[in-house]
């Protein structure tokens, strides 16, 4: 194997859900491994959670054994994981992987994470009068302590330092969460960090994108069916059975998990109590899970593709073509040759 070359760029592989990123990443790691060891950094907000294997399409133990993987199974579903934490972890891992003489390969579909890594993290969002009006209306009906309880679910760090009646600060924290999807505490962590700690990170970006959207839609449907057959419902039932999780948590808002949780809630309301772990979901509920889960996943894929198309510097491979993986591998090798001594 060639000696490590620090001039080689970090490689990023992005794409919509069900585009075949995991298989492509493993093939790419095998090809690159002939010249330099490769380690994969996951860029996926669902894969960070333990106990969420089926619905997140988590790489199998065999796949993770074939190539070192990072940022998988690093959080309990009760915990949040922000874009700021991802950037901090990814930058640290890139340095550690480089120090081992290996090449970082960042793979995933959480575009907020990629954006934060490539561009640096945005400043805290500005106030939104419409969001504030909705929060004020809820507070008038439920009281600020109720909204403080909600804040504790999505941003426990901020909630812990605020009194239940601190309406102004509770409103701002929930406003930031609703606008950005990130807890207020994550922005404070950025502001307190060392200069440049969360700046942009240079990567050569490659993407897998379908030429035919119907091809991806069909793959999404088939994969969701495979998840259901593999025990996805039981996986969510086991998470519910813990008793400390709820649907407002970031982990439980992941596509697929939200739809299964909602179906189980519906069955609990209409069938005399919550289903026990392993109990079958009624046919009506199963139909709803499939319909809503597939639709939500397709919407996610649409948003991912829209984000990718805003990145003109990417190298795109058509993932719905027969030789897609081989073409991707060749494109990455050519890019690395440009940096070879």
From Swiss-Prot:
The record marks 110, 132 as: Interaction with substrate tRNA. Residues 44-47, 168-172, 253-258, 302-309 are annotated as: Interaction with substrate tRNA. Pfam families: IPPT (PF01715). ATP binds at residues 15-22. Its cofactor is Mg(2+). It is an enzyme of class 2 (transferase). Monomer. Catalyzes the transfer of a dimethylallyl group onto the adenine at position 37 in tRNAs that read codons beginning with uridine, leading to the formation of N6-(dimethylallyl)adenosine (i(6)A). This is tRNA dimethylallyltransferase. It comes from Verminephrobacter eiseniae (strain EF01-2). The lineage of its organism: Bacteria, Pseudomonadati, Pseudomonadota, Betaproteobacteria, Burkholderiales. The gene is miaA.
């Amino acid at each position: 194997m060639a000696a490590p070359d620090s001039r080689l760029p970090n490689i990023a592989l992005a794409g919509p859900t069900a585009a075949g990123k995991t298989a492509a990443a493993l093939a790419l790691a095998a090809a690159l491994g002939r010249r330099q060891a490769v380690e994969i950094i996951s860029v996926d907000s669902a894969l960070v959670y333990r106990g969420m294997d089926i619905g997140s399409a988590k790489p199998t133990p065999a796949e993770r054994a074939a190539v070192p993987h990072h940022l998988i199974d690093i959080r309990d579903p009760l915990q949040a994981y922000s874009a700021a934490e991802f950037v901090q972890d990814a930058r640290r891992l890139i340095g550690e992987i480089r120090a081992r003489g290996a090449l970082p390969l960042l793979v995933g579909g959480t575009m907020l994470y990629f954006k934060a890594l490539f561009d640096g993290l945005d400043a805290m969002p500005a106030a939104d009068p419409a969001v504030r009006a909705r929060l004020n209306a809820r507070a008038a009906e439920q009281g600020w302590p109720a909204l403080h309880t909600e804040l504790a679910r999505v941003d426990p760090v901020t909630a812990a330092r605020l009194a239940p009646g601190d309406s102004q600060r509770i409103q701002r924290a929930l406003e930031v969460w609703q606008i950005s999807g990130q807890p207020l505490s994550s922005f404070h962590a950025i502001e307190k960090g060392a200069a440049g700690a969360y700046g942009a990170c240079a990567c050569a970006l490659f993407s897998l994108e379908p030429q035919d959207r119907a091809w991806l839609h069909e793959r999404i449907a088939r994969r969701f069916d495979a998840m259901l057959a593999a025990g996805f419902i039981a996986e969510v039932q086991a998470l519910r059975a813990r008793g400390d999780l709820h649907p407002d948590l970031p982990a439980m808002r992941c596509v697929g998990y939200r739809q299964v949780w909602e179906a189980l809630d519906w069955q609990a309301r209409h069938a005399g109590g919550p289903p026990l772990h392993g109990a079958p979901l009624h046919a009506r509920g199963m139909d709803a899970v499939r319909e809503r889960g597939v639709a939500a996943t397709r919407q996610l894929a649409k948003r991912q593709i829209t984000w990718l198309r805003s990145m003109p510097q990417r190298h795109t491979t058509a993932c719905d073509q027969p030789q897609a993986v081989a073409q991707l591998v060749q494109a990455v090798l050519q890019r690395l040759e440009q940096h070879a001594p």
